[in-house]
């Protein structure tokens, strides 16, 4: 569902490099202290998107007719909503840092 690992690794590097630069330039630890929370917030958003794409594009044997109708409604909404298309594009290429 989009190979999110590489995007997440790049964002980890972004957050870590900022934290290390701040620490070694001025001794500031604020970014270092927030590093895990900042990364995890982004990771869970990517995880949510991957889960959503999987449920949108795959069918599972344990799901019944109701879920099939929900999946079709979601696909219909996705194909007709500019806002939804923008959201999926933003998530697919990687959320802003």
Place the predicted regions along the sequence by residue.
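Glycine-rich phosphate/pyrophosphate-binding beta-alpha loops
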Residues: 1-7
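C-terminal helical "tail/cap" subdomain of flavin- and related membrane-associated enzymes
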Residues: 3, 18-97
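A general alpha-helical scaffold signature found inside nucleotide-binding enzyme cores
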Residues: 8-11, 30
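Extended, folded domain segments that form the structural surfaces/walls around functional sites
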Residues: 10-19
């Amino acid at each position: 569902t989009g190979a999110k690992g590489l995007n997440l690794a790049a964002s980890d590097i972004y957050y870590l490099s900022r934290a290390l630069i701040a620490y070694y330039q001025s001794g500031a630890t604020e970014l270092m202290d927030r590093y895990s929370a900042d990364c995890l917030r982004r990771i869970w958003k990517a995880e949510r998107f991957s889960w959503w794409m999987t449920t949108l594009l795959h069918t599972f044997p344990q799901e019944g007719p109701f879920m099939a109708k929900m999946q079709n409604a979601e696909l219909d909404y996705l194909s007709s909503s500019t806002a939804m298309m923008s959201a999926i594009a933003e998530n697919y290429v990687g959320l802003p840092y």
